[in-house]
UniProtKB/Swiss-Prot annotation:
Cross-referenced SUPFAM superfamilies: Homeodomain-like
Comp. bias regions, Low complexity: 126-141, 308-318
Subcellular location: Nucleus
Gene Ontology molecular function terms on file: DNA-binding transcription factor activity, RNA polymerase II-specific; HMG box domain binding; RNA polymerase II cis-regulatory region sequence-specific DNA binding
Family annotation (PROSITE patterns): ANTENNAPEDIA, HOMEOBOX_1, HOMEOBOX_2
Family that this chain belongs to: Belongs to the Antp homeobox family.
One Pfam family in the UniProt entry: Homeodomain
Effect after changing residue 42 to N: In a breast cancer sample; somatic mutation
Keywords: Developmental protein, DNA-binding, Homeobox, Nucleus, Transcription, Transcription regulation
SMART domains: HOX
Segments of skewed composition (Polar residues): 187-196, 256-266
Sequence motif: Antp-type hexapeptide, positions: 155-160
Official protein name in the record: Homeobox protein Hox-A3
Amino acid sequence: MQKATYYDSSAIYGGYPYQAANGFAYNANQQPYPASAALGADGEYHRPACSLQSPSSAGGHPKAHELSEACLRTLSAPPSQPPSLGEPPLHPPPPQAAPPAPQPPQPAPQPPAPTPAAPPPPSSASPPQNASNNPTPANAAKSPLLNSPTVAKQIFPWMKESRQNTKQKTSSSSSGESCAGDKSPPGQASSKRARTAYTSAQLVELEKEFHFNRYLCRPRRVEMANLLNLTERQIKIWFQNRRMKYKKDQKGKGMLTSSGGQSPSRSPVPPGAGGYLNSMHSLVNSVPYEPQSPPPFSKPPQGTYGLPPASYPASLPSCAPPPPPQKRYTAAGAGAGGTPDYDPHAHGLQGNGSYGTPHIQGSPVFVGGSYVEPMSNSGPALFGLTHLPHAASGAMDYGGAGPLGSGHHHGPGPGEPHPTYTDLTGHHPSQGRIQEAPKLTHL
């Protein structure tokens, strides 16, 4: 019983077209014959009968072939009676399947038999109706199923391409329209837009408008576009480029003015601002001092002391920082031809640091490569005019190499209201201090 049911089930499942890889039963020769014979609608019912008969014998493949041939003969002999042949096969399968097993358990396996046997015919019915050979109908059945997705797959990319083409066309058309202005970014990188050539009249009008207003409002832009026969986009982009150019020019001018403003402020030393301060500027900027002829005191720069003796106190505040006591300079031979005193600080260190004002807040001053100190016991010492020509002509060296009197100049003490100066007749050459730079310790 169990074996019979097992064989029946195997036969039923063997009749399924899903048992083999090609979609047909293991007995490849079993189905073509009933399929080829069953050209009518009733052939669908004969094939399960044969399939049920072939497993009922429980034989090997040769017996199955014989049974299939017998079924073929029985089915092919009376093709003129399809309804009579179509009805009995529905009923005979129970008696054919009944002998192998007793009747009580038979109803249990039998109901599953028609139910599984019923589904195969519709699945395999479509191929036999299309052609006589099963392999070709199977391929034909598979081909539409396969062709439809492939066709759909071929259609979808084509549709996408068409959409992309339409998008590209629209973008190219829009870019072409906007390229009429020759300023719009092209739709594709390959296509280069032409450079806009403005006429001189257009440039003049644009420059005029930019001169009055760097940022253009839309109404004015529309008006200018109509006036100059340009597009708004062209005018807008021209103004953008012009503003960038203007900023660049302003930045360049700012750099030039800043550098030019610094260099003139440093290079020319303002006269009469103070001895050491001016000397610092002159030394930093390396302004060479051009030694003049021995009588430079008749042509002194502004704020120097080479003026008549009456103007010494007036010219003092403009030449040096205000000293604690007012310093007066006395001339030895003021009446002798009106020649002013020898003033070693006529050019207060504006040259190369050889002369300086020896009275800035009582600090020692480096004069002519040496320090000058006063004679404290002589009161307000006067310069000897007898030695002035000699000192100014021969002994004076503006480069600081002249053999001037050595010594130190001390600031006015509490008992010395006026600074005094040594008589520069003693030509003691200062050893080792001729090329020495001034020591600016008070700044």
